[in-house]
């Protein structure tokens, strides 16, 4: 499976003969650790032989346009690595829907479902910012996150828009042998 990951230039220099690189957990922002840990649990369930490391993030589609900003801090020398990874070692998810996981939100497939769930939730839960939430609300939210992987349902949903869907790909190990192209750039 072809994917692209945006990395600082120094990542390539970390490779030694046959070495495998794993994502550094120190780079996971504390406020999103719950989401990254949830993704690790999903990778454990869905990727054979997954070893529990934090994921590398990449794009499955579309290929990142290096003329855009936001990939790295402005002025940073970076590179877009084109990778070819065994499909069984990659977990695809919808980038926009992923933000509900990051923000501990309920991932609805329609406006009606979203509004109905939130009406019930707001009537029943006093502290909406507590985490974990009381049951069954916590389980409802976490279960809804599984929809981040249902690319067909999200694409078919008017609620998630008709435009291009950005599909991200997570994988555990970055191998030099998987790198099939390197495009250097300076972040805007």
Where are these regions (language model features)?
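An acidic/histidine-cluster motif and surrounding catalytic segment
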Residues: 33-42
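Short, well-structured hydrophobic secondary-structure segments
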Residues: 39-40, 47-66
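Conserved NAD+-utilizing ADP-ribose enzyme module
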Residues: 2, 9-30, 52-54, 64-78, ...
């Amino acid at each position: 499976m072809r994917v692209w990951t945006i990395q600082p230039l120094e990542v390539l220099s970390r490779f030694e003969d046959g070495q495998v690189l794993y994502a550094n957990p120190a780079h996971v922002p504390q406020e999103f650790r719950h989401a990254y840990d949830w993704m690790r649990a999903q990778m454990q369930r869905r990727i054979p032989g997954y070893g529990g490391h934090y994921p590398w993030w990449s794009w499955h589609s579309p290929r990142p346009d290096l003329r855009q900003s936001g990939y790295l801090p402005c002025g940073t020398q970076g590179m877009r690595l084109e990778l070819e990874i065994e499909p069984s070692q990659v977990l695809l998810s919808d980038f926009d829907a992923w933000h509900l996981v990051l923000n501990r939100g309920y991932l609805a497939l329609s406006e009606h479902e979203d509004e109905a769930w939130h009406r019930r939730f707001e009537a029943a839960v006093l502290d909406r910012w507590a985490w974990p939430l009381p049951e069954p609300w916590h389980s409802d939210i976490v279960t809804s996150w599984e929809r981040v992987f249902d690319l067909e349902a999200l694409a078919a949903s008017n609620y998630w828009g008709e435009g291009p869907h950005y599909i991200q790909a997570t994988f555990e190990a970055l191998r030099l042998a998987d790198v099939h192209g390197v495009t250097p750039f300076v972040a805007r």
